[in-house]
């Protein structure tokens, strides 16, 4: 039986990350730094000897561009790639496109902090982290995890909050624990899974 390998990569810095804007389902591309982060992720995975069988990403360009750059560094651009909005970033609703300082002026520091850091309180017209997990987890269980358990080396390039959903189920974290977990941009996290989908080992390639 092949190893059951799953690699998660958060997209590199986007143009709106740089401008300190709430992004969500808006679709800015990577900055030069973000592209460099993605290429570096590919080099790190190449140094580890990874050969991927399949990749998953969101419908947003910053994640797709990250995946493309990673696969180019690996010389593995021909593998199947599945794109689905289930892996999209949390939808920030009325906050999307706003500078975070502007949002604090409009709604107040405390309210914006609640929207950003609570588990189940959504911003107006948007999703809470709980809502994001409810969208992402079924896709992971039904589409991604079966590939891993079949022994297919699987790469997922997505977003901070959608990847939190995967980390939450893989590491069996509580809502409080997942809220505290930050995923670095462009830093691969490698999971080796047991046959029952529990984590046998984890390696974080951040910096």
From Swiss-Prot:
GO molecular function: phosphoglycerate mutase activity
Record bears the keyword Hydrolase: no
InterPro entries: His_Pase_superF_clade-1, His_PPase_superfam, PG/BPGM_mutase_AS, Phosphogly_mut1
Catalytic reactions on record: (2R)-2-phosphoglycerate = (2R)-3-phosphoglycerate
An example Gene Ontology biological process: gluconeogenesis
Superkingdom of the organism of origin: Bacteria
Site (Transition state stabilizer): 159
Pfam families according to UniProt: His_Phos_1 (PF00300)
Known EC number: 5.4.2.11
Keyword DNA damage carried by entry: no
CDD domains noted in UniProt: HP_PGM_like
Active site: 11, 89
EC class: isomerase
Residues bound to substrate: 10-17, 23-24, 62, 89-92, 100, 116-117, 160-161
UniProt entry keywords in alphabetical sequence: Gluconeogenesis, Glycolysis, Isomerase
Pathway(s): Carbohydrate degradation; glycolysis; pyruvate from D-glyceraldehyde 3-phosphate: step 3/5
Family: Belongs to the phosphoglycerate mutase family. BPG-dependent PGAM subfamily.
Purpose of the protein: Catalyzes the interconversion of 2-phosphoglycerate and 3-phosphoglycerate.
NCBIfam families: pgm_1 (TIGR01258), PRK01295.1 (NF002339)
Subunit relationships: Homodimer.
HAMAP family: PGAM_GpmA
Protein name: 2,3-bisphosphoglycerate-dependent phosphoglycerate mutase
Name of the coding gene: gpmA
């Amino acid at each position: 039986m092949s190893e059951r390998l799953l690699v998660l990569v958060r997209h590199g810095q986007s143009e709106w990350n740089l401008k300190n804007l709430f992004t969500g389902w808006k679709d800015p591309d990577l900055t030069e730094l973000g592209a460099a982060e993605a290429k570096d992720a590919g080099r790190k995975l190449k140094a580890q000897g990874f050969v991927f069988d399949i990749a998953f990403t969101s419908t947003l360009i910053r994640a797709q561009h990250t995946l493309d750059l990673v696969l180019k560094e690996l010389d593995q651009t021909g593998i199947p790639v599945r794109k689905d909005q289930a892996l999209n970033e949390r939808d920030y609703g009325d906050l999307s496109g706003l500078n975070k300082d502007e949002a604090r002026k409009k709604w107040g520091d405390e309210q914006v902090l609640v929207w950003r850091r609570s588990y189940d309180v959504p911003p107006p017209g948007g999703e809470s982290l709980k809502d994001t997990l409810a969208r992402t987890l079924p896709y992971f269980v039904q589409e991604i995890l079966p590939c891993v358990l079949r022994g297919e080396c699987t790469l997922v390039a997505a977003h901070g909050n959608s990847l939190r959903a995967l980390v939450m189920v893989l590491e069996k974290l509580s809502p409080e624990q997942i809220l505290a977990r930050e995923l670095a941009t462009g830093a691969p996290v490698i999971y080796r899974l047991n046959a029952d989908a529990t984590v046998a080992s984890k390696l974080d390639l951040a910096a």
